[in-house]
């Protein structure tokens, strides 16, 4: 079973691949939640997604401005003690560091229920998450082909065609694979066949 483990700022994300689903465990400060996502629910579209708290960045800049203003004020008034401006500069730096370490850079993978699966791009490094996502999509495609890219003359034409269209729409099969299966379906199952086991 392939696994990916990611930890950042007390948050742990564990991903495990089985033969027909993805197990995802999210834990933070001892609170844990595990869900399983069937391969049928993974659309597979992957986009880059960054998360940052711009309010924290704005507040840091504001405190830096206060520190600079106090520094200039002390110089203009002939004062030598810059401890107050230095204090605010240190506070601003701490806030900026907090902002920096809480920025997240994810791969966002679309699910069928308008939810998304988030995987850190660079934890533990850039290559491992990429390889895991490739394995996820490869296993998903293999499973979906085995279970939905089949032709059964006892099943109705339209539902089987819908399966092939769905597989093509999520990238589980190529356009060429779809066209080949479509021609095979037309040759095997009567398009007008509506009842299982009976043709007209």
Q: Over which residues does each language-model region extend?
A:
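Phosphoinositide-dependent membrane-docking surfaces
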Residues: 22-24, 34-50
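Short, surface-exposed beta-strand-loop junctions and turns on beta-sheet-rich folds
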Residues: 29-32, 115-116, 126
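Charged, low-complexity cytosol-facing tails and large interhelical loops of integral membrane proteins
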Residues: 121-200
């Amino acid at each position: 079973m392939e696994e990916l483990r990611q930890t950042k700022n007390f948050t742990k994300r564990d991903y495990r691949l089985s033969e027909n689903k993805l197990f995802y465990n999210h834990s933070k400060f001892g609170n844990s939640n595990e869900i399983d996502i069937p391969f049928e629910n993974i659309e597979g579209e992957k986009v880059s997604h960054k998360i940052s708290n711009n309010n924290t960045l704005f507040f840091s800049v504001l405190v830096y401005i206060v520190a600079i203003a106090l520094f200039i004020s002390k110089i203009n008034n002939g004062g030598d003690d810059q401890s107050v401006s230095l204090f605010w500069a240190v506070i601003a730096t701490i806030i900026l560091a907090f902002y920096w370490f809480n920025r997240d850079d994810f791969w966002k993978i679309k699910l069928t229920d308008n939810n998304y699966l988030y995987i850190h791009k660079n934890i533990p490094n850039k290559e491992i998450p990429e390889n895991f996502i490739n394995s996820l999509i490869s296993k998903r495609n293999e499973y979906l082909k085995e279970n939905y890219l089949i032709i059964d003359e006892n099943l109705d034409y339209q539902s089987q065609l819908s399966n092939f269209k769905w597989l093509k729409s999520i990238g589980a099969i190529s356009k060429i694979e779809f066209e080949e299966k479509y021609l095979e379906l037309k040759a095997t199952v009567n398009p007008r066949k509506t009842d299982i086991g009976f043709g007209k």
